[in-house]
Regions:
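Bacterial Sec-dependent N-terminal signal peptides
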Residues: 1-19
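Residues that line or immediately flank small-molecule/substrate-binding pockets and catalytic motifs
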Residues: 8, 108, 123, 277, ...
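Catalytic loop of the DD-peptidase/beta-lactamase superfamily, centered on the K-T-G motif
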Residues: 17-53, 180-185, 189-193, 197, ...
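Active-site-proximal loop and beta-strand segments within enzyme catalytic domains
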Residues: 18, 26, 33, 37, ...
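Secretory-pathway/luminal and periplasmic proteins that interact with or process carbohydrate-rich
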Residues: 50, 108-115, 125-131, 188, ...
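Catalytic-loop motifs flanking and including active-site residues across diverse enzymes
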Residues: 78-82, 115-116, 171-174, 241, ...
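Coil residues (strongly favoring Ser/Thr
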Residues: 113, 147, 208-211, 289, ...
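Conserved residues at the C-terminal ends of beta-strands
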Residues: 122, 207, 371
Length: 440
C-alpha cells in the first residue's frame, strides 16, 4: 500500500491558488487508498459543485462500482426528516411540541412527564434501544411497532425527563408513531406525500428489505481476518423513523437547501428545529461550529453504512458523505470542511513505529482537553490513552514528538518540545481536525 505523508498546513497558499477541487480530491483519494473509504462525496457551495466523486464498490460480488448516483442507507440522518414531519404537523396546529407522550401512547410509563420536545432533542430519558443487547438478535426480524416499543417501554428511564441529554433512537421511533397517530397515515406515506414528493427528491425513500432499488449499494464490513463480508441485514422496521431512509448525496444537498430556505417548514418552525438546546442539539440535528463557522450537521450509522451531512449557513457550504462499508464518513466530512475553510488538515497515511528514549514520555503524561477529555499515562515504558471504563489504547511513537493510536483509527497525538525535552504544546489529530490540547 502506498504511503502518503503530507500535511495541508499552508492555508494562505490554498487561498491564493483557490484549487479546492484538487485539494479535496487529494484528501479523499488518500482516504480511499489508506483507510479504504467506500462511498460517495459531495461538496457544494453557493449552488456550485466544488467536488463530487464516488469510490469503491456498490456490489463486490458483481464488481459494480459506486457512482455519484448510488443510493445508500443514511441511518440517523433520517432523524432530521422525522423532526420536520413533527414540525409540519405542529405548524398546522395538529400537535404541539409541548404535548405529553401520554396523549399519543396513554399507557407509556411516565408518559405524563415526557414531551414531544424532549423526544426531539434526546432529553426524554428513554433508554436507547440500540444499546440493549436483546435488540440485536431480533434486528433481522420484521418486528411490529408494538414489539419494538415493548423492547424499551418498561426499562427504567436513564434520568428524570428534561434534566439531561442522552442520544435515544427510541425517542425518534416514538416520534414516528406520533406522526402516524396524528396524520392518519403510515410514517412512510406521510414523509413521501409531505416532504419527498414536494421537494422532488426522486432518490430518497424509506427503505425495507423487499424494495428493489436501481443503483442501490450493498453494505459491507470486514471480519476478524480482515476479509470483506456483507454487513448484517437488519430489518428496517427496527430503525424506522430513527434511521430507515435511503438517499443519495445530491438529494441530501437538495433537502438541506430546502430546509434552510424555509421551503419545508415555515420560518418560525425552521428556527425552532435548528435552535440548539442541551448539548448543542436541536430537533433531530446538531448545531455547533467549526472554528468561527456555524455548522448544522448530523451523522448516521447502520450496519454496513455510515453517513454525514453538514451545512454552514453563513458560508452556504454543504458537505455530504455516505459510505457503504462503515467508513468514518464524519471524519472525512470534517476534513473536507476544514479544507474549504483553509484550516490545517492531515492527509491520511500509514505511520511507522520507531524506537525512542522512553524517558521523554514522562513529559507527556497528564490530563488534557481537546475535542474531549484526553488522559495520557505511561505504563511499562509505553504511552497510553486512558479512559475510565474502556481498555487503554497504546500510542506508538512515529517520532519522539508524534504518536499514533494503535487501533488503526487514524488518530494521532503530537507535541512541541523545547531543547530540554519539556513539552510546550500538544495536539490531538483525528476526525478531520487538529486541535490543541489544553491542560486540565
Amino acid at each position: 500500500m502506498k504511503r502518503i505523508i503530507l500535511l495541508l498546513l499552508l492555508p494562505l497558499t490554498i487561498t491564493a491558488q483557490k484549487n479546492y477541487p484538487e485539494l479535496l480530491n487529494q484528501y479523499a483519494q488518500a482516504e480511499f487508498k489508506i483507510k479504504e473509504f467506500n462511498g460517495t462525496v459531495l461538496v457544494m457551495q453557493k449552488g456550485k459543485s466544488i467536488y463530487k466523486k464516488a469510490f469503491g464498490m456498490a456490489d463486490r460480488e458483481w464488481n459494480v462500482p459506486n457512482t455519484t448516483d448510488t443510493k445508500y442507507r443514511i441511518g440517523s440522518v433520517t432523524k432530521q426528516f422525522t423532526a420536520a414531519c413533527i414540525m409540519l404537523l405542529a405548524g398546522q396546529g395538529k400537535l404541539s411540541v409541548d404535548d405529553k407522550l401520554s396523549k399519543y401512547i396513554p399507557d407509556y410509563p411516565k408518559g405524563d412527564s415526557i414531551t414531544v420536545h424532549m423526544l426531539l432533542n434526546h432529553t426524554s430519558g428513554i433508554t436507547n434501544y440500540t444499546d440493549l443487547p436483546e435488540f440485536w438478535p431480533k434486528a433481522i426480524l420484521p418486528l411490529s411497532t408494538d414489539s419494538m416499543i415493548a423492547l424499551f417501554k418498561n426499562k427504567p428511564l436513564d434520568f428524570s425527563p428534561g434534566t439531561k441529554w442522552n442520544y435515544s433512537n427510541s425517542g425518534f421511533f416514538l416520534l414516528g408513531v406520533i406522526v402516524e397517530k396524528v396524520s392518519g397515515k403510515t410514517f412512510t406515506e406521510y414523509l413521501l406525500d409531505n416532504i419527498i414528493k414536494k421537494l422532488g427528491l426522486k432518490n430518497t425513500l424509506m427503505d425495507n428489505l423487499d424494495s428493489v432499488l436501481a443503483y442501490r449499494a450493498k453494505g459491507y464490513g470486514k471480519n476478524r481476518q480482515g476479509v470483506w463480508q456483507q454487513a448484517m441485514q437488519i430489518s428496517m422496521e427496527g430503525p424506522y423513523s430513527a434511521g430507515a431512509m435511503v438517499s443519495t448525496v445530491e438529494d441530501l444537498y437538495q433537502w438541506t437547501k430546502a430546509l434552510h430556505n424555509n421551503q419545508v417548514l415555515a420560518a418560525a418552525s425552521t428556527q425552532k428545529m435548528l435552535t440548539p438546546y442541551k448539548e448543542n442539539y436541536g430537533y433531530g440535528i446538531g448545531i455547533d461550529s467549526l472554528k468561527t463557522h456555524k455548522r448544522v450537521s448530523h451523522s448516521g450509522g447502520i450496519p454496513g453504512f455510515a453517513s454525514y451531512l453538514s451545512y454552514f449557513p453563513a458560508d452556504d457550504l454543504c458537505v455530504a458523505v455516505i459510505s457503504n462499508n462503515g467508513s468514518n464518513s464524519s471524519s472525512l466530512g470534517v476534513a473536507l470542511e476544514s479544507i474549504m475553510f483553509n484550516l490545517p488538515v492531515q492527509i491520511p497515511y500509514t505511520p511507522k513505529e520507531v524506537k525512542i528514549d522512553t524517558a521523554i514520555l514522562d513529559n507527556y503524561v497528564g490530563k488534557y482537553i481537546a475535542t474531549g477529555p484526553i488522559e495520557l499515562i505511561k505504563k511499562n515504558g509505553k504511552l497510553y490513552r486512558h479512559r475510565d471504563g474502556s481498555a487503554d489504547i497504546e500510542l506508538k511513537p512515529e517520532s519522539k514528538t508524534r504518536f499514533f493510536y494503535a487501533d488503526n483509527s487514524g488518530r494521532f497525538i503530537e507535541f512541541e518540545i523545547d531543547k530540554t525535552g519539556k513539552m510546550i504544546k500538544g495536539w490531538f489529530i483525528g476526525n478531520g481536525e487538529k486541535v490543541e490540547m489544553k491542560n486540565q
